């Protein structure tokens, strides 16, 4: 029952989170900083109350290691959200971030000296090809935007290239953070809830450098049209409602993934998260009518098929950790 409940949380939380993020970004493309700050603040407060026990519970992993992890996590979060302000459409944003396997493999080979089977190299080639196709076709769409002069068109394309560079940087940084986490957990044991709290609490002072931008968007949000929240009947600016729902659904998504990791194998978790991304992508295309050609569909299929090939989820689908433990006892 718990795995099914967790899957429901992941799909409901993560998919709706993407919807509210796109609603925010479509109205104010530069709102990434205030969105990131709100998410970090909410999760930090929740963790301070329930995980850190109001600061009375000492961390299992030394703070100096969290400081390194937090620097990377903060950078990745800010850069990923800011990329939406650089002519990056939400579908491309989701597809590009789905390429984390490539970055993980590359850095795993370089840093951890890992070696992989030819099957996994093939799957990574599929993912790479899919991302390249989607990126290339998106580049063509940027260059042929209607209503833009040659100068404005070139400027839009230049900003788009900067957005691609930002996403690439965030992808590699995220993979490096994953490797760092792997080494920490190997040394100190897994403390995912604790890591979640410190990863969101420690970076909060860093938002001081983004205070001006955050304040500007607070003003913009206050000026948005009023919206009456269903059921409770409270009236508030619609942008604040979108932000509130984005933060809440982000938390639901994270909690769902956490429950899933305690109940199922990592491969099953990967499958659920991958399918969730695919559903979010489809919804974004259909509901928001984002441009998506047959080439985009081909690239998307390459990305998701390659991801499923890499994880070999069909061999472990539905296997819970308790079942694995039973099998171990039999052996």
From Swiss-Prot:
Record-level Gene Ontology MF annotations: UDP-N-acetylglucosamine transmembrane transporter activity; UDP-xylose transmembrane transporter activity
A Pfam family reported for this protein in Swiss-Prot or TrEMBL: UAA
GO biological process, one term: regulation of gluconeogenesis
GO CC entries: endoplasmic reticulum membrane; Golgi apparatus
Motif range (Mediates endoplasmic reticulum retention): 326-331
Membrane topology: Multi-pass membrane protein
Keywords: Endoplasmic reticulum, Membrane, Sugar transport, Transmembrane, Transmembrane helix, Transport
InterPro entries according to UniProt: SCL35B1-4/HUT1 (IPR013657)
Subcellular compartments: Endoplasmic reticulum membrane
Keyword Transcription regulation appears in the UniProt entry: no
Reactions mediated catalytically: UDP-N-acetyl-alpha-D-glucosamine(in) + UDP-alpha-D-glucuronate(out) = UDP-N-acetyl-alpha-D-glucosamine(out) + UDP-alpha-D-glucuronate(in); UDP-alpha-D-xylose(in) + UDP-alpha-D-glucuronate(out) = UDP-alpha-D-xylose(out) + UDP-alpha-D-glucuronate(in)
Spans through the membrane: 4-24, 30-50, 59-79, 92-112, 124-144, 153-173, 201-221, 229-249, 251-267, 268-288, 294-314
Superkingdom per UniProt: Eukaryota
Main subcellular location: endoplasmic reticulum
Function: Antiporter that transports nucleotide sugars across the endoplasmic reticulum (ER) membrane in exchange for another nucleotide sugar. May couple UDP-alpha-D-glucuronate (UDP-GlcA) or UDP-alpha-D-xylose (UDP-Xyl) efflux to UDP-alpha-D-glucuronate (UDP-GlcA) influx into the ER lumen, which in turn stimulates glucuronidation and excretion of endobiotics and xenobiotics.
Family: Belongs to the nucleotide-sugar transporter family. SLC35B subfamily.
Record's protein name: Nucleotide sugar transporter SLC35B4
Organism: Mus musculus (Mouse)
Lineage per the UniProt record: Eukaryota, Metazoa, Chordata, Craniata, Vertebrata
């Amino acid at each position: 029952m718990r795995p099914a409940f967790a899957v429901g949380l992941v799909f409901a939380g993560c998919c709706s989170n993407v919807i509210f993020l796109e609603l925010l970004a479509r109205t104010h493309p530069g709102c990434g900083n205030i969105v990131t700050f709100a998410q970090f603040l909410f999760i930090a407060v929740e963790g301070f109350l329930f995980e850190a026990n109001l600061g009375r519970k000492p961390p299992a992993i030394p703070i100096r290691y969290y400081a390194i992890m937090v620097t990377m996590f903060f950078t990745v979060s800010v850069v990923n959200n800011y990329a939406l302000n650089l002519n990056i459409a939400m579908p491309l944003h989701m597809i590009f971030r789905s390429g984390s396997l490539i970055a993980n493999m590359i850095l795993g080979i370089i840093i951890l000296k890992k070696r992989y089977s030819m099957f996994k190299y093939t799957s990574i080639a599929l993912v790479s090809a899919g991302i390249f196709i989607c990126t290339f076709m998106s580049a063509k769409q940027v260059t042929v935007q209607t209503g833009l002069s040659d100068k404005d068109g070139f400027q839009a394309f230049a900003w788009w290239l900067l957005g691609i560079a930002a996403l690439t940087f965030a992808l590699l940084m995220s993979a490096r953070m994953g490797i760092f986490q792997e080494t920490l957990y190997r040394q100190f044991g897994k403390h995912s809830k604790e890591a979640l709290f410190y990863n969101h609490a420690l970076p909060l002072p860093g938002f001081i450098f983004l205070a001006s931008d955050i304040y500007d968007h607070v003003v913009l949000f206050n000026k948005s049209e009023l919206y009456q929240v269903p059921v409770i009947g409270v009236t508030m600016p619609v942008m604040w409602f979108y932000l509130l729902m984005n933060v809440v659904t982000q938390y639901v998504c994270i909690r769902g993934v956490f429950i899933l990791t305690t109940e199922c194998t990592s491969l099953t978790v990967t499958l659920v998260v991958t399918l969730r991304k695919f559903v979010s992508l489809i919804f974004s295309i259909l509901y928001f009518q984002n441009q998506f050609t047959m080439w985009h569909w081909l690239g998307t299929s390459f990305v998701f098929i390659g991801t499923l090939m890499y994880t070999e989820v069909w061999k472990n689908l539905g296997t819970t950790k308790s079942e694995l433990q039973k099998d171990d006892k039999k052996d």
